[in-house]
Structure formats: C-alpha cells, structure tokens
Regions:
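N-terminal membrane-proximal hinge/A-helix region immediately C-terminal to the signal-anchor transmembrane segment
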Residues: 1-103, 118-130, 166, 202, ...
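Cytochrome P450 proximal C-terminal region
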Residues: 2-6, 10, 128, 174-177, ...
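Cytochrome P450 heme-thiolate monooxygenase catalytic core
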Residues: 2-14, 77-84, 96, 100-102, ...
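Cytochrome P450 I-helix active-site segment
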Residues: 12-19, 121, 125, 173, ...
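Conserved cytochrome P450 K-helix E-x-x-R motif and the immediately C-terminal K′/meander segment
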Residues: 23-44, 213, 301-341, 362
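Cytochrome P450 catalytic-core helices
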Residues: 268-287, 291-293, 403-419
C-alpha cells in the first residue's frame, strides 16, 4: 500500500485513541487486550489501530465481518497475525492462502469426517474418564489446568497413536502450553520486540524450536516406517493424496498441518470446558438440568458419541461459553482494492476483527455480558442477528475441526458431571486471559462425589 493510498484510507477511518510513538496501540493492546477490542465498536464500523507503525483496520459489526469472511473472502489473504505465526505453524491450513489452502483443505477435510470423529471419540471418552478417575473427593482441582491437560492429551493421542510418536506426545505436553501463553501478544506486537532478551522470548523460542524438531523427526521416522493401517492423524496425513493431482504432502507439510491442529484445537477445547464448569457452579439450576439430562440420556454407563446429539443442554452451555470467551483477534490482508462498508481500502491493507468483541456487542445480543444458555433454544436463537455468531469462523476459512471440538467437549462435560459435583474454592475469582482464545488464569474447584 503506497503512502498516498494509506493517507486516503486514514482520512475516512476513525483512529482509535491511545496510540503512542513507535508502538502505536501495541502497548494498550498488551495491557488490556479485551477491554481494547471491545472499546472499538464505539468508534465506528471500521476503526484504525496501529500495531507499531503498521495501520490495521478493524471491522466491528457482524455485517462487515461477514463481508471479510464470506462475501468478499477471495479478496483477502491471511494477514500479519498469521505471518507472525508462520514460524510455528508453517503453511498449514491456518496460514496457507489461495490454491495451496484449497489443496490442503481438500486433503485434510476427510480426517475430520463423521466417521473419523466417531473413531476419535473413543480416545476422548477414555481420556475424560481417566481425568475424572484421577480426582479424589474433597481435593481442590485447578479446572483450567485440568482441562488444558485433557485437551492436549487427547490431541496428542489422536495425532500420534504408537510408541514411535511418544517423543512428539511429550514435546506437545511440555511445549504447547508455553507457546499458547504468549501467542496473541507475540503475533500482535512489532517484530523487533521478539529480540528483547527477556524470559518470555527465550521460553517461547526454545519451546517452538523443540516442538518443531521433535515433530520433524517423528514424521520422518513414520515416513520411513511406511505403515498405513493406523487411524491417527499422522498416518492419515502421510497417506493423503490430492484427488486432482494425485500428489501427497511433503514431510514439512505434514508437520505444518499437525502444528495447525495443535494450536487451533488445544486452547479452544480447554477454554470452553473450563468456562463451562465455572459458569455452571454459579447457576445450580442449569447444572441440575444438565445432570438430569445426562442421567436420562446416558444413565450410569460411559458417555459415547451416540449420546452427544441428545445432550442438548450441554450444547447450549458450550455455545454460550464460546460466545462469551471466544477468539480474541483475527487478521486478513486485502489482495485487491476492497469496499468495506463505507470505506474503500486499497490492496495490501491489513484488516482485523474480534469475535470476542462481536459476540459481546449489546447492539447484537440482549444482556450480552450475561451467561444465558437458553438464548440458544430454537425459539430464541432466531432472534440472534444473522452472521452474528461464528465461534469457529465462517466461509472457506471456517475451522474444519469444529465437530471434533463439539464432540470432545460434550463428552468431557457429561463424564465429569456424571461423577462429580464442583464447587468454587475460596480465595480466588477467575480472571480472563487473552490468548488466541480467552481462557481463565485459574479456576480452583473442590470436587465431591455426586449423589
């Protein structure tokens, strides 16, 4: 984007207050990202935010977000946010553009089919039961940490199902939490801050290097091994072929897709589960309704994938926590001049939107800040504006693993509530922490056997 084009865009788009020299709004975003992204709606439908010296134009309404993600999706590529994540996830689905994205999506989509998720559900159930079995009556469990471990364990077991994959499983357990902790700030901050000799940078760089190195070795070893009779993601990716060209994925492409699944899947599931339990203990009426539903649908046996579509109360709770605690910020870049609402943006313009802010907009949702799962009852769901709820994105960039997350989270909620009653441990009120999605700092709870 030329200086002249940038000036024309700047002349018609309101700039958010609070920018400082060199850093722009990066410091404000770092200090309180959730408050900042929610404040932008009050400044217009499109608001300019400066990340360092880079202007970013933030769309704040469901209609404009739909323009970016669906109606004019082919006029956008992944933007700076994803450029900054490329050292972690390479050119996996989250980062790929154009024909590369379409090719990889065709090849990866079958791995999240209904039949595959049925297979993965056995791992989800087994890990949920192991988690519930590990708790002792009267002990305090950090639910945020427990759900993070469950989500990472399930992803790792789904990706690497043999002894050969154990080094990768251990690398995921050790390094993924370190990377997720600093993901948003790293992606949104000016690149020169990466070089500051501070512990956060050292830990991040070390974890990224270790994780990529171990997964590279496991992928190469699996390729040499040549076995194709397993159903883990690694084996499926190695065997995948493009239906048009007949070409498979290179080892680097396999590594990139595995990394993408890790970053996209672990934090979303863990956050949704932790917030679900947190919200339910404050609403015993809803918890009792869910427990009654579990007893009616599941009984005292194991929760299976056949039960998932019938556990409708759990689905409404998960919908509501994903609305309240969703994706913090996503970015795109225009590839051609784009008309976005009343604003003409030239090619090369960085554009962003916050699902977290959009899903909490009081102009869109009645009692937007309140936890109200019944807003997702069929008779009330119609009142939600079209395109206003997209927890997994929309259009050709919608997350292909959404059914994986719904299934995994439903099985976990039902398994835990079937066995345990949770109550808040005194002395701590959970606080929101902005990362790729909004998770809690800690949610300590006392667990007691359910009568």
């Amino acid at each position: 984007m030329s200086v002249e084009e940038r000036d024309r865009a700047e002349s018609v788009v309101t700039r958010a207050p609070g920018a400082v020299p060199l850093l722009g709004h990066a410091l404000t975003l770092w200090r309180d990202p959730l408050k900042f992204v929610q404040s932008l709606r009050g400044h217009g439908d499109v608001v300019r935010v400066d990340l360092g010296r880079l202007p970013v134009y933030v769309a704040t309404t469901p209609e404009l977000v739909h323009e970016i993600t669906v109606t004019q999706a082919r006029s956008f590529e992944k933007g700076r946010f994803f450029d900054r994540l490329r050292p972690l996830a390479g050119n996996g689905l989250a980062n790929a553009d154009g024909e590369l994205h379409r090719r990889h999506r065709r090849m990866v989509q079958p791995m999240f089919s209904k039949e595959r998720i049925h297979t993965y559900s056995h791992t989800m159930r087994r890990n949920a039961e192991a988690m519930a079995d590990s708790w002792a009556p009267g002990t305090v469990v950090d639910i945020q940490q427990a759900m993070a471990e469950y989500a990472i364990e399930t992803l790792a077991d789904t990706m690497f199902s043999t002894e050969m994959g154990m080094p990768a499983v251990e690398a995921v357990r050790k390094n993924l939490p370190v990377l997720l902790k600093n993901l948003l700030i790293r992606a949104a901050s000016p690149k020169f801050l990466d070089r500051l000799p501070i512990r956060a940078n050292r830990d991040f760089d070390r974890a990224a290097t270790q994780l990529r190195s171990v997964i590279d070795e496991v992928v190469a070893q699996a390729r040499r091994d040549g076995q194709t009779d397993r159903s883990d993601l690694l084996t499926l990716l190695l065997a995948a072929q493009d239906e048009d060209s007949g070409q498979g994925l290179t080892d680097t492409e396999v590594r990139d897709e595995l990394s993408t699944v890790m970053f996209a899947g672990a934090e979303t599931t863990a956050s949704a589960l932790a917030w679900a339990f947190h919200e339910l203990v404050a609403r015993p009426d809803i918890e009792e309704q869910i427990v009654a539903e579990i007893r009616s649908v599941v009984g005292e046996g194991a929760v299976t994938i056949a039960d998932v579509p019938r556990l409708t109360s759990i689905r409404r709770v998960l919908d509501e926590v994903l609305r309240l605690h969703g994706v913090t910020l996503l970015m795109r870049r225009t590839t051609v001049p784009v008309q976005l609402g009343r604003h003409r943006l030239p090619a090369g313009t960085e554009v962003a939107f916050s699902l977290y802010a959009m899903h909490r907009d009081p102009a869109v949702y009645e009692n937007a800040a309140s936890f109200d799962p019944d807003r997702w009852l069929p008779e009330r769901r119609a009142a939600v504006a079209r395109h206003a709820y997209i927890p997994f994105g929309a259009g050709n960039r919608k997350c292909i693993g959404d059914q994986f997350v719904w299934t995994e989270a439903t099985i976990a909620v039902a398994t835990v509530l079937q066995r345990w009653k949770l109550s808040p441990a005194p002395g701590h009120t959970p606080k929101e922490v902005a990362s790729a999605v909004v998770h809690a700092d800690r949610i300590p709870m006392t667990v007691s056997p359910r009568d």
